Amino acid sequence: MPEGKKPAEDLYSAKTHLHQPVPEVSTVNATALPADAPEGALPSEVRPEIVTWEKLCEAIKASGKAYNMEMITKAYDLANKAHNGVCRRSGEPYICHPLAVARLVLDLGMDSESIAAALLHDVVEDTPTTLEDLTAAFGEEVALLVDGVTKLTKIQFSNIEELQAENLRKMLLAMSRDVRVMIIKLCDRLHNMRTGDAWPEQKRRDKARETMEVYAPIANRLGILNVKEELEDRSLHYLDPVGYEEISKMLSERAGEEFLARVSGVIEQRLKESGIEGATIKRRVKSIYGIYRKTIMQNKSFDEIYDI
């Protein structure tokens, strides 16, 4: 990195005025694993299940929140028709991608307009559908969300100077107008990184670097920490597959989630015995990239890191 340049994280920590407050974002299920995932697996190690329209509807119902199903269904129908006959590089029908993005947006607790926009986020860029068509069908709010995501998608990061200057400002500007645009884009990038094995090797590395330098810091700024960590882990998997696999293997050999749950139960029981009621013990396994970064920056071996 050239002298005088700040890392992307520092740029994002600068004071930026958001014209709209950041919505309350849930981080509980944003990177939930499929039911058949191996025990102790990290989100970055498991290929996500394919989200169907039926599964999305079930998830909406299970959320217990009141959503505008008429709008969401209409958005799905339009997207399904617009992407009909198109497949992703992985071979899946293209509609699987907007459905997966919509599910991630739902899991983050976003509103009906955000879910509809997630379903529609690629139709203006990739199909004959126009912004005017969306405005007529869904109103200006949904159309503007889709337009915002489309504009972010068109931003290119060809070198580190651009990354830290003009394009970064454009991203922050889009974020300040309506933060929902950025949340949809983060979910779009997360699903693309989950399915990035189908990309050519150079594209995987380029997307991973862009994700690490741009999208993960934004997720961190918005407080969506599990999305941030999965973006970092999946990026590391493409940028340094050997380092990723080494840490992943060592983590699997250490105490996993089952052990943490058992220890948490013991602590909660001891607290109750001491007269402390209602205490909640929170636990998490440190991300692969978090461990990787610590070993590099602090020049420590895996066995010297104790906060895993």
Residues covered by each model-derived region:
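Active-site helical microenvironments for divalent-metal-assisted chemistry
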Residues: 2-308
